[in-house]
């Protein structure tokens, strides 16, 4: 069985499937204008498949507001997943705002500033 660290290939496949299903369900089933545009970045499952950390980014809304709405709808999304996935245990969903994109943008700006400063010093 292929493993990445201590994550099995089944864990990775199920994580990907949950991410795809949730992305579709959030777009089609949750009709809350306060939510904005949610993009699911990744899903991380515990080894026993009991819990899933769902990492998301959001445009057009505050991350805290989006997280609160997703947390409120987690039970509903869980029940929809149960109907779609046909597996014995559907993990409990835990939504987390993914700040890695913001950090990457910030780091890119710092690198660009450093390069601009270096270019001025070289002149």
From Swiss-Prot:
Keyword Oxidoreductase included in the entry's annotation: no
Domain of life: Bacteria
SUPFAM superfamilies: Ribosome-binding factor A, RbfA (SSF89919)
GO CC terms in record: cytosol
UniProt-annotated location(s): Cytoplasm
Gene Ontology MF, one: ribosomal small subunit binding
GO BP: maturation of SSU-rRNA
Protein task: One of several proteins that assist in the late maturation steps of the functional core of the 30S ribosomal subunit. Associates with free 30S ribosomal subunits (but not with 30S subunits that are part of 70S ribosomes or polysomes). Required for efficient processing of 16S rRNA. May interact with the 5'-terminal helix region of 16S rRNA.
PANTHER family to which the protein is assigned, alphabetical: RIBOSOME-BINDING FACTOR A, CHLOROPLASTIC-RELATED
Subunit text: Monomer. Binds 30S ribosomal subunits, but not 50S ribosomal subunits or 70S ribosomes.
Protein name stated in the entry: Ribosome-binding factor A
Gene source species: Cupriavidus metallidurans (strain ATCC 43123 / DSM 2839 / NBRC 102507 / CH34) (Ralstonia metallidurans)
